[in-house]
Regions:
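Alpha-helical transmembrane segments of multi-pass small-molecule/ion transporters
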Residues: 1-306
Length: 306
């Protein structure tokens, strides 16, 4: 919270410019986060211990699909949402899947469990990044008009770093990485989490909300994203009883507010930004209460935090 507040006030007080925050965000996405992913996976991942690694990208698709289906259901009930169906569905589908879960995990779990959860999250992000830059672009910009997106966007730096790390581990090449390379990579990767929280706070400060508009679609979108989706996964996890850390991963991802990337995609695709920006801003504020609520319910019924 403190780091997020620092990012927010650095931007609001113009200590850091909008261009400076953009550069910092690009460094986090393009350098520090990929290095953290590569470092953690090559140091701690092996295919025997994580034999079910391929499930995690599919879990990302599952979380997206549940949000999409809930969104379609609400649109079918309230036809006034049809005019903003794309942004509404984007809000329902895509969550802040990396910037918030990583620091939350680091603060909630013991060090050994944190390492495993980081790997789970990185594998989850493999599916998430490919989904948001393909299906996410389609949903936001292709309703009733021609659209296009560059498939190269699906293979961004975090995705490439994850795939490269898996290849290195698979062929046993980690032993050929000298310490004078692995140590700096690890040190720079550790910068990803605190910087990512500052970026989230800064991005919230950049969202310009002069007046609250699109109140009904925003509220309905946040009801889907922050209440219906986590409630559905709470029931799912309690019934299916997956491994404890897998259950926590699903609950964390299901509880997250709308992804800040939606605003970037909407701007690039010239889609409606107003609804998305408001949902991101107020969704992050509301999640201060909804995340502890659902994680508390999960811990109470599953006994995870006992």
């Amino acid at each position: 919270v403190i780091l997020g507040a620092v990012g927010f006030f650095l931007i609001r007080r113009k200590v850091v410019s909008e261009e400076g925050l953009k550069t910092l965000s690009e460094l986090v996405i393009g350098l520090f986060l990929p290095l953290l992913m590569f470092s953690e996976i090559t140091a701690r991942f092996n295919f025997r211990q994580f034999s079910d690694w391929w499930i995690f990208p599919l879990l990302s698709v599952l979380v997206t699909a549940v949000g999409y289906l809930f969104g379609l259901f609400v649109v079918a009930l309230d036809r006034s949402l049809v005019s903003q169906e794309g942004p509404f569905l984007g809000i329902a589908m895509f969550q802040n899947s990396g910037y918030l879960p990583l620091p939350l995990v680091a603060s909630l779990l013991a060090p050994d469990a944190v390492s495993d959860m980081f790997i789970y999250i990185f594998l989850f992000l493999l599916g998430f990044n490919m989904m948001i830059f393909s299906f996410g672009v389609f949903v936001l910009s292709c309703k009733g008009r021609a659209c296009h997106f560059d498939t190269k966007d699906m293979f961004n730096a975090p995705v490439i770093a994850t795939i490269l790390a898996l290849v290195v581990v698979f062929f046993g090449w980690t032993r050929f990485i000298p310490s004078f390379v692995s140590k700096p990579v690890e040190m720079m990767g550790r910068c990803a989490i605190p910087l990512s929280i500052i970026v989230v706070g800064g991005n919230l400060a950049l969202i310009r909300i002069r007046s609250i508009q699109h109140v009904r679609p925003m509220l309905l979108g946040l009801v889907v994203k922050l209440l219906l989706v986590p409630l559905a996964f709470l029931v799912f996890v309690l019934l299916v009883k997956p491994k404890p850390l897998v259950g926590l991963l699903l609950m964390l991802q299901a509880c997250m507010p709308p992804a800040a990337l939606l605003s970037v995609i909407a701007k690039n695709q010239k889609a409606e930004e107003g609804l998305i920006n408001q949902a991101i801003f107020y969704g992050h504020l509301a999640s201060i209460f909804t995340i502890p609520l659902f994680l508390g319910l999960y811990g109470f019924f599953s006994g995870f935090f006992n």
